[in-house]
């Protein structure tokens, strides 16, 4: 996959993340809004930390880390002529998720989290978080597809 396609994928993911956050902010009048009753609800949270709210006392540091990761990924994307399928998808999803949460950090000083799984005690998250986890799956598939048995 070519560099421009990876960047385009990242922009789509980041845009979708920002759109879902905007929709959640503007359409959630109460603290909790059921999406799928008993399974998923909207619960707006201003998360100043990273995953599981770690480093919440250092939002500026997290902003710098987001910016650095995004810049390194962009430089890496443009330093290569092409990527294999899983690697390209992994990098695209990672950059898109990093930019989505990074934009929140840079603009707002926190990340907008809003998806809550009701049956399990799991941190509230957003589409950028989902994208980063999907990226890890694609990157793992890339590694496993190169292994010879």
Question: For each of these PLM feature ranges, what is it?
Answer:
Residues 1-149:
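Alpha-helical transmembrane bundles and membrane-interface segments of multipass inner-membrane proteins
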